[in-house]
Each structure stands twice: as structure tokens, then as C-alpha cells.
Amino acid sequence: MQIRHFLQFKDFDRQEYEYLFDRTRWIKNEFKQYRRYWPLTDRTLAMIFEKHSTRTRLSFEAGMHQLGGSAIYLSTRDTQLGRGEPVEDAARVISRMVDIITLRTHEHGVIERFAENSRVPVINGLTDEYHPCQILADIFTFMEHRGSIAGKTVAWIGDSNNVCNTWLQAAEVFDFNVHVSTPPGYEVEPERAGLYGTDHYEQFVSPHDAVKDADLVTTDVWTSMGFEDEADTRKNDFADFRVDAEMMACAKEEALFMHCLPAHRGEEVDAEVIDGPQSVVWDEAENRLHTQKALMEYLLLGRIGVR
């Protein structure tokens, strides 16, 4: 079977995602029914993390165990990567000892170089540029609650970060619209915006205008990992971009709210929104587990048929 990697959302087509979501539904149901499903017995996942993580690490580690395999966590601080070993050399060695790898790092170029030299599938557990596993779970969560996302409108409020970038790629795959509203100076990079065009992406100055008639409102922390030195400046710059009840009222009545977590109540979102009836953030977080189990199954076994 040809080795496939999952480094960006555009690495798979819509048909493949529909298959993954079908598998996710079945795998999640088996999990809820406490039925054992071990298709990855004797397979090993290596998780190489340069950045801190709660949900990504836990969902991959628990997911691999629940599929019958085992998982090994490697921090770059504890390996030779942290002492300057070339990424290419690390990929060649590690991929001879395990069956699949999740890499969470800063520069997206690092994971591309790693994948080019790996003998096994590599999954992007987050880079500064993309977070495809998060959007995989987000779209599945939307489908659970509202059906197909095709033709819908997603409003992204806040920093145009890696999650925002991935939403833009997903809009191309699933044919939905993304409204982005950021403070001046934090807009989607012009060269990146040019990749998507106005059919699926539109930039708004006012967050309330961006949210108008949206089916899904989503945001993230104002200060992503690696930008801690800018925290005070960002709090001032993003002060008008907090998702509150007034902003949610501009969206459709049945609109959902998502946040990839961790959240800072009173900053990017008010407590009454994230803890309110429109919020599906806890389903969203749980679905990281189920979608990534389907992803690992697909990368290691290919299509096995929907049960």
C-alpha cells in the first residue's frame, strides 16, 4: 500500500473525508457500546512533540491504545532532535522502528522534510501553519449536529492562525464559506488569501458583520504558542473581537459555537457563550479521539469498508 501522509487538509479529497466520517461514526459507536475493536494490534505510534499539548497528545495516545496498538511519547527536549540532529536523519531512524508518526512542531517545513524521509505515514499534530486534525474533528462535529456543511457559512473571529488557515483549505474541499474577521495587522496573509478566492473566503473588518447569518461561529486564543511576548499587546488589539451573546445573536438562531481549546473565558469568548446551549466544544474535543482513530486506521489499513 502506498504511504500517505496527513500534513494539510488538502492532502485528502472530499470522497476520502466522507469515508473517514463514515468510519468515525462506526468507531465512535463501538466505543460508546464498550465493544472492543483492535484493528491495529501490534502497531506502534510515535508521538514527537515540540509544542505543549493536552487534547492532541491524549486523543492520539488513548486512540492508539483503544485500537489495540501502543503509543510512545517523545519530546524533542528528551531526544537528539533537541540537540541538533537533522530532521531527515531522525525520520529515517524513527520510521524504521514504528508504524505511524504524529509530529507536533513549529515550522511546517520541518514536518514536510520529516515526511519526505519517513518510511511510514506522518500526521500533522499541529504546526504554526496548519492544524488539520482539529478541523477534521470540527467538521465531523458540525455534521453530527447540523448535517452537511456544504453551502454553510463559518465565521472565524480573532487571529488568522493555523486553525483559520485550515478552515480555508477545508472550505475548498467541502464547498462552504468562511468569513474571517481580525484586527488590523492580523489579517489572513495576502499570498494565502490569494489561494482561496472570494468563492469560499471573505475578510471582514467588523466581527458582527462576519457573523451575520453564520451557521457556525468559531474562535481561538488571542495569543497562540510562541507569541507569549505579545500577550499584552494582543489583549488590547483583540478587545473588540470577543465572542459574546450579542455577537452570537447576529448569527443564525440555530448557529453553533466552537473553540479548539484551551479557552480563556472573558478574553476571546464569554463564559455564557462557551458554556451556553449553542456551544458544542465538548463534543468537538471528544471527537478529536474518534476522528483520529479513523484517520490512523485509514493510513495504516486503507479502505476496509463501512460497517
From Swiss-Prot:
<keyword id="KW-0028">Amino-acid biosynthesis</keyword>
<dbReference type="InterPro" id="IPR024904">
    <property type="entry name" value="OTCase_ArgI"/>
</dbReference>
<dbReference type="Pfam" id="PF02729">
    <property type="entry name" value="OTCace_N"/>
</dbReference>
<protein>
    <recommendedName>
        <fullName>Ornithine carbamoyltransferase</fullName>
        <ecNumber>2.1.3.3</ecNumber>
    </recommendedName>
</protein>
<feature type="binding site">
    <location>
        <position position="162"/>
    </location>
    <ligand>
        <name>L-ornithine</name>
    </ligand>
</feature>
<dbReference type="GO" id="GO:0016597">
    <property type="term" value="F:amino acid binding"/>
</dbReference>
<feature type="binding site">
    <location>
        <begin position="260"/>
        <end position="261"/>
    </location>
    <ligand>
        <name>carbamoyl phosphate</name>
    </ligand>
</feature>
<dbReference type="InterPro" id="IPR006130">
    <property type="entry name" value="Asp/Orn_carbamoylTrfase"/>
</dbReference>
<keyword id="KW-0055">Arginine biosynthesis</keyword>
<keyword id="KW-0808">Transferase</keyword>
<dbReference type="InterPro" id="IPR002292">
    <property type="entry name" value="Orn/put_carbamltrans"/>
</dbReference>
<comment type="similarity">
    <text>Belongs to the aspartate/ornithine carbamoyltransferase superfamily. OTCase family.</text>
</comment>
<dbReference type="GO" id="GO:0019240">
    <property type="term" value="P:citrulline biosynthetic process"/>
</dbReference>
<feature type="binding site">
    <location>
        <position position="288"/>
    </location>
    <ligand>
        <name>carbamoyl phosphate</name>
    </ligand>
</feature>
<feature type="binding site">
    <location>
        <position position="80"/>
    </location>
    <ligand>
        <name>carbamoyl phosphate</name>
    </ligand>
</feature>
<dbReference type="InterPro" id="IPR006132">
    <property type="entry name" value="Asp/Orn_carbamoyltranf_P-bd"/>
</dbReference>
<dbReference type="Pfam" id="PF00185">
    <property type="entry name" value="OTCace"/>
</dbReference>
<keyword id="KW-0963">Cytoplasm</keyword>
<dbReference type="GO" id="GO:0042450">
    <property type="term" value="P:arginine biosynthetic process via ornithine"/>
</dbReference>
<comment type="pathway">
    <text>Amino-acid biosynthesis; L-arginine biosynthesis; L-arginine from L-ornithine and carbamoyl phosphate: step 1/3.</text>
</comment>
<feature type="binding site">
    <location>
        <position position="220"/>
    </location>
    <ligand>
        <name>L-ornithine</name>
    </ligand>
</feature>
<feature type="binding site">
    <location>
        <position position="104"/>
    </location>
    <ligand>
        <name>carbamoyl phosphate</name>
    </ligand>
</feature>
<dbReference type="GO" id="GO:0006526">
    <property type="term" value="P:L-arginine biosynthetic process"/>
</dbReference>
<feature type="binding site">
    <location>
        <begin position="224"/>
        <end position="225"/>
    </location>
    <ligand>
        <name>L-ornithine</name>
    </ligand>
</feature>
<feature type="binding site">
    <location>
        <begin position="131"/>
        <end position="134"/>
    </location>
    <ligand>
        <name>carbamoyl phosphate</name>
    </ligand>
</feature>
<comment type="function">
    <text>Reversibly catalyzes the transfer of the carbamoyl group from carbamoyl phosphate (CP) to the N(epsilon) atom of ornithine (ORN) to produce L-citrulline.</text>
</comment>
<dbReference type="InterPro" id="IPR006131">
    <property type="entry name" value="Asp_carbamoyltransf_Asp/Orn-bd"/>
</dbReference>
<feature type="binding site">
    <location>
        <begin position="53"/>
        <end position="56"/>
    </location>
    <ligand>
        <name>carbamoyl phosphate</name>
    </ligand>
</feature>
<dbReference type="GO" id="GO:0005737">
    <property type="term" value="C:cytoplasm"/>
</dbReference>
<dbReference type="InterPro" id="IPR036901">
    <property type="entry name" value="Asp/Orn_carbamoylTrfase_sf"/>
</dbReference>
<dbReference type="GO" id="GO:0004585">
    <property type="term" value="F:ornithine carbamoyltransferase activity"/>
</dbReference>
